[in-house]
């Protein structure tokens, strides 16, 4: 959209972040009037965010790079309730101790993408427990309850989904929408925050906050959502057959993170380069045109750039070198994922199919047998019989390298 005047909206539109905006023209005007504050909320349901939340982090990064102040809202209060959005069943209730542990783990990733401090555009991290814990229930209902209608809330997709499936939606979860709306008003009062961003599934919750700000404080607030991404094959972003693709390196190694992006489907390379890297659009356009084997070079660039942002330059370079050694030279790099097996078991010999299952390269004995029979499973880069006993004599530099297909490698070490 060439008519957009603000750098932020122009960038997020050109790169594919934009899904909906409450008032694009008015927001564009506000963003040309100087530094503004925007926030995105993150509930603390695990000790790390995964790739599914990376687009939101990139939105905050672009917000800061274009001269504005990003606010990271940690949901220390709302996580106690659980966001029903996108869920067809109630979330598991978490204790305060678990929430605190999760929050500590999640916080670390933001320092890699944002600059925190006391400056005008420096990022700020806040916890909604700081104000939600102090709310008096009767006062909250009296002051804000009349601004929300059950009629409207029943139209939200997250509510309709539960009701249509005749699945319980607790009053506890129903209150989540009120509290998220109140968060926006509180951040406006404390930090003059005018914009809430989030995934498209949060549209209803964001609208609640925009409308509550207008009714309670006569404030002009805005909402902007990004699309919920799937891969070209329909898979959810951040999910693989082996589980979530975590952003914290204590949950997933930089090598495995790099591999996830290296294995991007051809049709997704250009889109992911726009969303998850800061490469110029003309360079991305060049990479998008690559075909055949050349597209693999674009995938390596994607993997390098995303890993660099998330784990640092050194980790990205090391992951790329591990890939080169593993795939181009056949060397079993020590940076490959590792599984430890008791030395006594390995000395006695473990059938290859059983070892593949224990290493997580196959979900069942049957799957492992088929993999090995078809030649897709290898031990130290050699095809073996499914019942071949893998033992101490197979150790190479203290490890046995298992391979499933062309891209999955595990080192088995005796302990």
Swiss-Prot record:
Compartment annotation: Cytoplasm
Main location: cytoplasm
Catalyzed reaction equations: tRNA(Tyr) + L-tyrosine + ATP = L-tyrosyl-tRNA(Tyr) + AMP + diphosphate + H(+)
Its EC number(s): 6.1.1.1
GO molecular function term, any single one: tyrosine-tRNA ligase activity
GO cellular component: cytosol
Broad EC category: ligase
Binding site for L-tyrosine: 39, 176, 180
Signal peptide: none
Keywords: Aminoacyl-tRNA synthetase, ATP-binding, Cytoplasm, Ligase, Nucleotide-binding, Protein biosynthesis, RNA-binding
PANTHER family: TYROSINE--TRNA LIGASE, MITOCHONDRIAL, TYROSYL-TRNA SYNTHETASE
Subunit structure: Homodimer.
Role, per record: Catalyzes the attachment of tyrosine to tRNA(Tyr) in a two-step reaction: tyrosine is first activated by ATP to form Tyr-AMP and then transferred to the acceptor end of tRNA(Tyr).
Protein name: Tyrosine--tRNA ligase
Source organism per UniProt: Paramagnetospirillum magneticum (strain ATCC 700264 / AMB-1) (Magnetospirillum magneticum)
Higher taxonomy: Bacteria, Pseudomonadati, Pseudomonadota, Alphaproteobacteria, Rhodospirillales
Gene that encodes it: tyrS
